């Protein structure tokens, strides 16, 4: 019996392991003091959550027991590391995560883009290859293939940084890059609009620090950067699409439905409900799951 109890306890610990936390960190002094933290792990909703040093307002559970949504109030939060602990029904600590609240850096006050700006739209994979060592990555399916018209050609963040003199000489004041977050589509991933991780720069473009370095280089020149970040849909290779928190997390039909792209329907008082639904809830392409923006989480 004692041996079985030990096995049972070990299985509890194994089941409760935190696999992901998003966002992975946050900042003090944000204008919006509310923060929602997603915790993901096998059957993690079965456990109680306690937080030391952070004001945990409530914990929301969903259909899928692999998720917990933690709502915090950071009105008076200071930078530092704070424990998020999981406890079982016997009040035994099962797992722990040290969550970081960073200090906001006092950067230069740079105004938003306006009619005086010359904006240059860059598709990074097609612009310049500054680091050939990251053209392919073992974690991602599609590899570099310059012979393929729709394949990856190797452009990256380093290529943009190395050409800032050229862009500035052209009179460019603002760079708008197409999305740079990870896209693990097996084909045509160079456009990066089917994001599979919205907290990670695609390794074939560089790292999160490389993106930060690009922004710093631009700001030192008095230039601006526009971040293209997709919130309408995710790629079907995104880990959450493979294990949905709720059935209504994405838009679904009895069979696959593509958006009709008829934007005028949205403001047309005579448009049919069917056409409006297809416009708003239809998918761009089969590899891009349309997110349900009506879901409160």
How would you describe each model-predicted region?
Residues 3-13:
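Sec-dependent N-terminal signal peptides
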Residues 16-45, 103:
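Beta-strand/beta-sandwich contexts
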Residues 31-81, 86-90:
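Immunoglobulin-like IPT/TIG beta-sandwich domains and homologous Ig-like subdomains
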Residues 93-102:
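Edge beta-strands of extracellular beta-sandwich domains
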Residues 101-121, 126, 130-131:
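Low-complexity, Pro/Ser/Thr- and charge-rich linker/hinge segments at domain boundaries
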Residues 128-173, 177-297:
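Substrate-binding/active-site clefts of carbohydrate-active enzymes
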């Amino acid at each position: 019996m004692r041996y079985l109890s030990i096995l049972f306890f070990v299985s509890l610990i194994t089941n409760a392991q935190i696999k992901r936390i998003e966002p992975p960190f946050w900042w003090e002094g944000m204008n919006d003091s509310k923060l929602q933290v997603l915790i993901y792990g096998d059957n993690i909703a079965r456990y109680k959550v306690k937080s030391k040093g952070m004001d945990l307002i409530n914990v929301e559970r969903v259909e899928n027991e692999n998720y917990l949504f933690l709502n915090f109030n950071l009105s008076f939060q200071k930078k530092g590391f704070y424990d998020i602990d999981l406890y079982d029904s016997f009040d035994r600590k099962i797992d722990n995560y040290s969550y970081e609240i960073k200090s906001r850096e006092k950067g230069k006050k740079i105004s938003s883009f306006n009619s005086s700006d010359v904006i240059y739209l860059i598709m990074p994979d097609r612009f310049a290859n500054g680091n050939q060592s990251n053209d392919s990555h073992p974690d991602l399916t599609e590899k570099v293939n310059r012979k393929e018209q729709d394949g990856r050609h190797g452009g990256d963040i380093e290529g943009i940084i190395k050409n800032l003199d050229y862009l500035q000489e052209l009179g460019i004041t603002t760079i708008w890059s197409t999305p740079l977050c990870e896209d693990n589509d097996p084909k045509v991933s160079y456009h990066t609009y089917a994001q599979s991780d919205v907290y990670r720069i695609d390794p074939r473009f560089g790292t999160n620090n490389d993106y930060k370095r690009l922004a710093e280089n631009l700001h030192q020149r008095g230039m601006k950067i526009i971040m293209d970040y997709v919130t309408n849909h995710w790629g079907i290779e995104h880990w959450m699409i493979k294990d949905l928190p709720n059935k209504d997390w994405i838009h679904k039909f009895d069979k696959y439905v593509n958006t009709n792209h008829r934007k005028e329907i949205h403001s047309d008082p005579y448009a049919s409900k069917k056409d409006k639904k297809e416009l708003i809830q239809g998918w761009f392409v089969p590899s891009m799951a349309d997110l349900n923006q009506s879901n409160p989480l």
